[in-house]
Amino acid sequence: MATLTNGQVDAAVHGGAASTNGLVNGISHTHSPASCATIPMKDHDAIKLFIGQIPRNLDEKDLRPLFEEFGKIYELTVLKDRFTGMHKGCAFLTYCARESALKAQTALHEQKTLPGMNRPIQVKPADSESRGEDRKLFVGMLNKQQCEDDVRRLFESFGSIEECTILRGPDGNSKGCAFVKYSTHAEAQAAISALHGSQTMPGASSSLVVKFADTDKERTIRRMQQMAGQMGIFNPMALQFGAYGAYAQVQQQAALMASVGQGGYLSPMAAFAAAQMQHMATINGLPGAPMTPTSGGSTPPGITAPTVTSIPSPISVNGFTGLPPPQANGQAPAEAMFTNGIHPYPVLQEVVFREDSEKGGLGVAQRSCFGVQGSCFLSSLSEAQSPTAADPLQQAYAGVQQYAAFPAAYGQISQAFPQPPPIIPQQQREGPEGCNLFIYHLPQEFGDGELMQMFLPFGNVISSKVFVDRATNQSKCFGFVSFDNPGSAQAAIQSMNGFQIGMKRLKVQLKRPKDANRPY
């Protein structure tokens, strides 16, 4: 290579040597924003525009003639995928003068449709331009008879209004709210200070509301929170704290035993609460969870363990009887299965108090499942026994069973809430075939925890992983989510593919099999 005579190698090595064919000089000029004679300068208040709905076959050189008629261009960049290099159908444009950007926006935004596109071109300030300088206001509690001109007259004394739009329903009637956009942040702030809560419009239920409009990111977060709330993510009743319910049930029933042992009779309200304890747990979707004994022994000392073939009937106290739990297809109660696939053998399933009306005494029959399938403890007290005779039995339940319930309760609660740092071990766990999703265009700030929270509404997420650049420790904006069944994965694809977060739309699709050339 050193023997070449045209100087190409020397020019490439030394980065500036003159070449006889001018090749190096030609390359160096293609990357400059303009020729050496005229380097463009932009105003300090120049606006960076986002251009959307442009054909993917048009490059910078093809778009320049369209925008140059409104003023001198400082920078025009077509956005391309950093992984695939493909055209994204949008661009960023910065004029040297602010007025040129405003003219281009007025003339082109949703006014012209480029060849091959179904929607008109979008020309508006980029998010980064408005993030630090909010100018758009939300106005609420307006009179529904007011039109745009009335709203303009109300706000025009505080500055120049660029946009004024009243929100209307499908029938065309006003919703009593509007958006007002000023040319500067200071004008918008002045309108808020002067008008917010200052008066009550005719027909409005409260005073005028004037505040900055939500950003795209805030609206996206609110939509996700609403969706999560509807799906029950943040509702403790949907997390199936069966063990926690069993722990509370143990404590309440131990208190009932103590009150019966001391007074011999329960108040009607306490008796009714005891009778409905199991029924409320059933209708709330909180069946008692199976408990594992904390010690090696399966029964407390001095108590025999006869076999019981079925789960006892609901509580009956002072004549109040709880509703029986529902059974599907005539299945036996002892073999019932809940949605989490666990057999319902709850701690302290039944406490029965019988009042002997003839002798005026008190009989207590008590059954307690102790976490062993089909094995329960049965102990009975005759009506001749004194209240103090129940103390050993009471101590057995109060001192052993409530502590047996607590570890499993704590374990289920800790598993139900997603833990941010170590949600997944170092290695990505995968679900069955057809249950693993590839997610692209994630926000830069999303981690494993946020990714899991976003997909929890669609089913049981067994793992979530956002890939991070090892050198910079920054997110690569893509990751994987694994469900335990294909139905949840398909539901997530249908709902989240194309879901917009900020300026990007999520790409959600099934992960390719391991034998494929690429994982996505």
Curated annotation (Swiss-Prot):
UniProt-recorded Gene Ontology molecular function terms: mRNA binding
Location in the cell: Nucleus; Cytoplasm
Cleaved signal peptide residues: none
GO annotation, cellular component aspect: cytoplasm; nucleus; ribonucleoprotein complex
A matching Pfam family: RRM_1
Similarity comment text for this entry: Belongs to the CELF/BRUNOL family.
Protein's name in the database: CUGBP Elav-like family member 4
Transmembrane region(s): none
PANTHER family: RNA BINDING PROTEIN
UniProt function note: RNA-binding protein that may be implicated in the regulation of pre-mRNA alternative splicing.
InterPro entries: CELF3/4/5/6_RRM1, Nucleotide-bd_a/b_plait_sf, RBD_domain_sf, RRM_dom
Upper taxonomic lineage: Eukaryota, Metazoa, Chordata, Craniata, Vertebrata
Keyword Magnesium: no
Keyword Protein biosynthesis: no
